[in-house]
From Swiss-Prot:
Biased composition (Polar residues): 1-15, 100-114, 885-910
Residues with N6-acetyllysine modification: 145, 227
Enzyme Commission code: 6.5.1.1
Chief localization: nucleus
Location of Phosphoserine modifications: 50, 52, 66-67, 230-231, 801, 908-909, 913
Positions contributing to Mg(2+) 1 binding: 621
List of residues binding Mg(2+) 2: 720
Protein name: DNA ligase 1
The organism of origin for this protein: Rattus norvegicus (Rat)
Classification of source organism: Eukaryota, Metazoa, Chordata, Craniata, Vertebrata
Reactions listed under catalytic activity: ATP + (deoxyribonucleotide)n-3'-hydroxyl + 5'-phospho-(deoxyribonucleotide)m = (deoxyribonucleotide)n+m + AMP + diphosphate
Subcellular location: Nucleus
GO molecular function: ATP binding; DNA binding; DNA ligase (ATP) activity; DNA ligase activity; metal ion binding
Modification sites for Phosphothreonine: 78, 195, 234, 798
Amino acid sequence: MQRSIMSFFQPTTTEGKAKKPEKEIPSSIREKEPPPKVALKERNRAVPESDSPVKRPGRKVAQVLSSEGEDEDEAPGTPQVQKPVSDSKQSSPPSPDSCPENSPVFNCSPSMDISPSGFPKRRTARKQLPKRTIQDTLEEPNEDKAKAVKKRKKEDPQTPPESLTEAEEVNQKEEQVEDQPTVPPEPTESPESVTLTKTENIPMCKAGVKQKPQEEEQSKPPARGAKPLSSFFTPRKPAVKTEVKQEESDTPRKEETKGAPDPTNYNPSKSNYHPIEDACWKHGQKVPFLAVARTFEKIEEVSARLKMVETLSNLLRSVVALSPTDLLPVLYLSLNRLGPPQQGLELGVGDGVLLKAVAQATGRQLESIRAEVAEKGDVGLVAENSRSTQRLMLPSPPLTVSGVFTKFCDIARLTGSASMAKKMDIIKGLFVACRYSEARFIARSLSGRLRLGLAEQSVLAALAQAGSLTPPGQEFPTVVVDAGKGKTAEARKMWLEEQGMILKQTFCEVPDLDRIIPVLLEHGLESLPEHCKLSPGVPLKPMLAHPTRGVREVLKRFEEVDFTCEYKYYGQRAQIHVLEGGEVKIFSRNQEDNSGKYPDIISRIPKIKHPSVTSFILDTEAVAWDREKKQIQPFQVLTTRKRKEVDASEIQVQVCLYAFDLIYLNGESLARQPLSRRRQLLRENFVETEGEFVFATSLDTKDIEQIAEFLEQSVKDSCEGLMVKTLDVDATYEIAKRSHNWLKLKKDYLEGVGDTLDLVVIGAYLGRGKRPGRYGGFLLAAYDEESEELAAICKLGTGFSDEELEEHHQNMQALLLPTPRPYVRIDGAVAPNHWLDPSIVWEVKCADLTLSPIYRAARGMVDKEKGISLRFPRFIRVREDKQPEQATTSDQVASLYRKQSQIQNQQSSDLDSDVEDY
């Protein structure tokens, strides 16, 4: 009969006779006595062995491999194959209610070796290994059967419901173990009679026997979530309370995750998007970078511009409502920038460094990564694939938008000999922490080629929608999540367009998100014009001119208004800013800070202004100047000048500033003033210096002959032609716009197309004959603003010198792609030998424009089925100051074609009338 453990520690009581010690029972009888079939631990509904801190020794070779102490392999609750001799197959440690007679750990019999002081002697595996008996041999098949049962149960586990958390799954398994049918054991004493308290007196010899498992427990590492040892010798009731507490602690965890879905399932492109309920993070938390990556994925999957804007807008709405401090980093990551252009922060990580970082972070061979990049043509996809195949023992914390953006800025600011190693460490750290598609877009951002088709105007449109639909500045929980709700589709569209114009106009005057975003979050979108105004130090996007084909077109357009003609100088745009403190800044047409490029110009600023002038913004053209001959030098001479950190004493190419507009003066913006007033203030407050600072040569006239003569003279004076501008009517300075109030007239316009075109190089053809081994032709494309795609327009092969072809061939090796970018459209054009990353802009001249069934540019704008191509295109120069998004658009191509047709028709009609009159 199985007895409780207390019977071995208690003296004879009045309730019954004292039981004889176990040692008095002959061993032969003890072997024949059947063991208990189920441990009392299970019968008392105690925790399973898997949760018990009392584990069996991990080193199997140190266990006694006899019938008294077999190693246990069965899982908790698994039906045991009973032995006729030993009960040591139970997986759980001996419970306090029973003392297995043959247990090697809790052997309560005096037959155990005991020292004279009453403590059990130390037993070693080698000394205690008994000889194998026939009984052991007969028990081995039973062990094999039990292990087979265990294996089948492991291979066919019960799948818990998907809604259960990890803690609930464990509890469910425990309940299944407890509910398994068991053979009732022999009656024992009540739980109260077997409870061991601290106040009970235990004999020294018994205490010594009890102390052995405690010492073994102390020598083992603590189990996960280990409890005090005494808790495992208590009844089931406290264990139930513990489980209830665990379930209660798990309940708020499930409630927390209910409102914040997993970022892996985040979908900002869904219809009826809710900025709070559909977000994958909570109020006050940092925006996970995976949310931005998922947004980029959705944008990459579509080609419709409106859908792109809507998807990005949904993400921005959630950021505004939940984590407004992360709005600025999200916008810069969407634009693939690190700040305003004037800060000059660029990542500039080459593909070689990027591939090495991917290899070291993922453990792949560099050669295999390079081969995969050559095959796929996208370092981002290769990084994502390499990262997805790696498994980490301890995953890194999830990436956040602010964390990634900060790391990018750190990379851009690192300089010096050791900077490359530091950059490598930062990049490796980012890749190690990446999940899913995060590696793809981090790699693309680092390479400077995010290329989602998200132009600046699209990002601004998305920001305007987000700031309008989900107004910032609301206390959480946000009351208004969709301010456009209730409006008709047409009214909603017009309202969003008006809101977008407010933001775009503000951005034209203050193209600095660092200044705009704080104001937007504090005061709202409609208050931007009041708080964000034009000021020195913040570069403006310059006003641009439309081309014309001849003097007659100019007179026809400006028939009833006064206008002026100015020389069009062949140089680089230079926007001169002088702040109130006297600091001088010079910016390019792309808002890049060129102050370090022109130290000679900065030194002459105090001489060109009157003392009363404290601050101003001048629009000028920097032109190469020959001081000896006192004449303008060709544009190519200016391009040889050093670009950064120029020492004034080492300057060889001198420049002269030709000023033609004044936008800001002494704290007042002049952009709304007419040109006549701006020109007057320019000449009153500044002084000319020959060869250093000169006003643009101009002529106010409406006489066609005088304009023609003035045009001829401009060409003789090494200028491109004329700029014709209105003086009073519609004569404001339209920032960042190509206005019809400014017209450009070149000498070449009178012979053919009204303007040169700035086109993007998307492919290269290998040369033949005189040009073997290098590129002899190139495939060019125009930019489509509506779809934000590049559409092929012509093949170019003339206008190059041998030196230029060699230089182009070398520079383009770093731009090679196995396939074109997804936003490049060629249709029926002949595919080039090598595809190129579309990042180079060339200025091209042609004889005329023609309809083409092959090229896609401007398709559907003039003809439903045909596009427009160039006849006899010729290379002019590289436009280093332009990005692909600033290339000639399809609308401009169609406009040039229409003007060409109109003039041809007018000329033919004039000839017909002359013939009739003759």
